[in-house]
Amino acid sequence: MTLPLAKFDAAEPLTPAIRIRDLYKRFGQLTAVDGVSLDIAHGEFFMIVGPSGCGKTTLLRILAGLDSITSGSIEIETPNSQRPVNSMIFQGDSIFPWMTVWDNAAYGLRMRHVPAPTIKDVVGHYLARTGLTRFAKYYPHQLSGGMRQRVAIARAFANDPEILLMDEPFSALDAQNKLLLQEELLRIWEDHKKTVVFITHSVDEAVFLGDRIMVMTAQPGKVKAFVPVPLARPRNIMELQKSPQYGELIAHIWSSLRDEVHRARQQEEEMKS
C-alpha cells in the first residue's frame, strides 16, 4: 500500500497558536531547555520525542504555566477568551479519586461556572465518545488504568481548552489498551481539531498520531529536527503498518534520535560514577 509522502523538511506553520523563541530553562547550573524556538499551528497535532531527561516535560510544564522560563519568550494566541488556555493530561492518574467519573469530567466546567444544562450535555457527550456512559457513577478505584485515562481525556476535551497538553498519557498501559486509546483520541480530535502538544518516547506513536514531530537532543535539550508526517487522515494503524512510507518515517526519526538516546545513557552513567 502506497501513501503520499512529503519531504522531511517541515516549514513553520503560517498561523501559530504557540510561538516560542530562544527559550532557556535552567535549574541552578543545569540547563534543561537550551534555546528552543518553534511555532505550532492552530489545530496541529504536534509531537515531541527525545531521550529521557532532555527537557520535554519541562517544556510542557512551561506551556502549562506550571514552570517559569529563565529567558526567551512564549506567545499563546487565545482567540476565545471564554475558554481556558490549556488542559494537561499526565502520565499517571490525574483524576480526583474522591469524585465519580461524571464529577471528574465536569470539574473544569463547574470551576468556570458553566450552566448546569450545558454541563449535562457536554459531559454526556464526552463520556459517550470515550465509552464511559455506563460508568458515570463509578469511582476511579473501580476502574482499570485505561479507563481512568479515558476519564482524563473526557475531562480535558469537555473543558474545551484552546490547547491540549499531553505528557506520555498512555505510557503505563498495555499495548492493546494503548492502541485503543490512541484511536479514540484521534477520533475525538478529528471532530474538534484542538491544538495538541503530545510528549512520547514511542516513535511509532508519534508517527501514528502526529502532524509534525520535534526531535530533541540529549541534555541540554535543543531542537535537533522537525519532521512532518504527511500521511492522510483519518488514520488506521492496521493500514499504516502496511505502507512503506510509515516504516520510512519511523526509520528516519529513529536515525535522528538514536545518537541522542546513546548520549543520554552515557550522561546517566557519568552521573552514577
What residue spans do the PLM features occupy?
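Conserved ABC ATPase "signature" region
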Residues: 110, 117-135, 187
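Conserved ABC ATPase signature
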Residues: 139-143, 147
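Short coil-to-helix segment of the ABC ATPase nucleotide-binding domain corresponding to the Q-loop/switch region
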Residues: 99-106
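The feature captures the beta-strand-to-loop junction immediately N-terminal to the Walker
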Residues: 49-51
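Helix-to-loop junction immediately C-terminal to a conserved catalytic motif
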Residues: 64
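Conserved ABC transporter NBD signature motif
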Residues: 71-82
